[in-house]
Amino acid sequence: YEPGGTLQIQHDVLKELGYPEINTIYDYEEAIKSYIEANPTTEDGQQRIGLSLMASDWRWLITTGNIASAALGIPDDGQFKVDDETGETTYKFTLPEIKEYFQWLNHMNDIGLLDPESFTQKEDTYKAKISSGRVVGLSDAAWDYSDAEKTLLSEGKAGSTYARLPVTVSEEYK
C-alpha cells in the first residue's frame, strides 16, 4: 500500500518547521510560505517554487481536478461524485463546495506561491524542476513524479523528496 495523499511537501520543510500538523490547504500554504521566506533559494542558488502542478495536458485531472475533489473528501469516481446510498451521480466540477479549492489555487497564484507555468509547462520541464529540489510542494500522483524523486535520492537529496499529506479544504472534510 502506498498512500497518495492529496498534497505533497518536501521532507526538509517538515523537519525545519518542527513537523507541524498540516490538515487543511491553509495549513499547507502556511508551511510553504514560512519555509520559502526562510529559504528563498536552494543550496545552489536556484529560486524555490512553492507549489507546482502538471496541468497543461491530460494530467490536469490528476494534479488539479482529482485533488480538488479529494480535498473535499470525495472518492475518485472519475469526474463524478456518487452518492453511495442513492447511486445519484453529480459532475463534481459543478459542486458549489469545489469552488473553494480553485479559489485557493488562484490565491496561491496571487501571492506568488503557485508556479506560473503550472498550466502551460511540459512534462520534461515539470520533472526537471522537481529533480532540482526547487519545488517545495506538489499536487500529484506518486507515479507521475517518482522518477524525479529517484534523481533526488541518487544525488543524496532525500530531504527534497515528498511526504504525502491527507490535506483537506477545511476541518469539516475527512
Task: State where each predicted segment sits.
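Extracytoplasmic/secretory soluble proteins
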Residues: 1-174
